[in-house]
Amino acid sequence: MTLDKFIDQAISPWMREEGPDKDIVMSSRIRLARNFANQTYPILAKEEKLVEIQEFIRDEYANKSFQTYKDLQYVPLTDLSPVEKSVLVEKHLISPHLIKHSDFAATLISENEQVSIMVNEEDHLRIQVYYPGLQLKTALEQSFALDDWLEEKVDYAFDETKGYLTSCPTNVGTGMRASVMMHLPALVLTKQINRLIPAISQFGLVVRGIYGEGSEALGNIFQVSNQITLGKSEQDIVDDLESVVHQLIEHERMARNHILERTGKKLEDRIFRSYGTLAYSRIIDSKEASKCISDVRLGIDLGLIDNTSGNILNELMVLTQPGFLQHYANRSLRPDERDVLRASVIRERLKLEE
């Protein structure tokens, strides 16, 4: 797969696959933070040291394959335009932090985009493995295997007492962030989410928006992840997160049934109005688009809409973001121009489903 395909395709190949509870849990991710032993962390390292790490990763891993993860493509961020960098963030293949320090940063991306390894982010390596639906345990197993493969050539910074050493103290220990992306429209509509988020934090977990820390929960999509990395094993962290996610799934399903029973016609009207907005509007901003896509996704999950697939909505969530729209237009766009193009892209994509 070429870099162009990473940029041009809105939906990653792995996202087209089925997964457990995929109507609510869109994806599972394991991210491991790792550093080279006896090397200064990227935020304090000299330029020549960052270049050394970049070149080592390129020479040892570019175009290599590990198990089902084929042809890891090495992409220096200096090769990308600002818009192309934004697209990779919108696809969750790199982080916003990596863009801010992109002069000596790079990423390795597998052919199916299920694996991305960020180089010289906050830590020397940030290893990400994604799976569709609720598959945290499988993602953990695969991330361990990938980590072991990398460690054959990389001497990690590790302390027998503290565990993996990281740039930020909150990652010391396992160096792991386990997270799931969840679509929770019924909990938002019934306002139960306001009660559940504080309760979740008491379990050492955190709830964020779609793009992680500091981001908004656009389209009723929430990221739930662990905060604690020290004093617990990776398996215990995943077990605790999975337990809470199962409870959230149950609450969301109950809320959906409750709304359907109590206000069936109103809910149906809301869903089809949103579908109409997506299908016919000429101008639409990102917030309204995200809200309407969420409504239509709910309609599909409840069996009210049968002529549109959930994958199309996953695709639209990326297609309608500012970076992707500007890539599509092949030029910078003012906000009002983006709103016009966004409406056009959505109309065209929905017509293909008819």
Swiss-Prot record:
CDD domains (alphabetical): bacterial_phosphagen_kinase
One annotated GO biological process: phosphocreatine biosynthetic process
Keywords of the record: Allosteric enzyme, ATP-binding, Kinase, Nucleotide-binding, Transferase
GO CC field: extracellular space
Regulation: Appears to be allosterically activated by the binding of pArg-containing polypeptides to the pArg-binding pocket localized in the C-terminal domain of McsB.
One of the record's GO molecular function terms: creatine kinase activity
Gene3D superfamilies linked to this entry: Glutamine synthetase/guanido kinase, catalytic domain (3.30.590.10)
Motif range (RDXXRA motif of the pArg binding pocket involved in allosteric regulation): 338-343
The protein's name: Protein-arginine kinase
UniProt organism field: Oceanobacillus iheyensis (strain DSM 14371 / CIP 107618 / JCM 11309 / KCTC 3954 / HTE831)
Source organism phylogeny: Bacteria, Bacillati, Bacillota, Bacilli, Bacillales
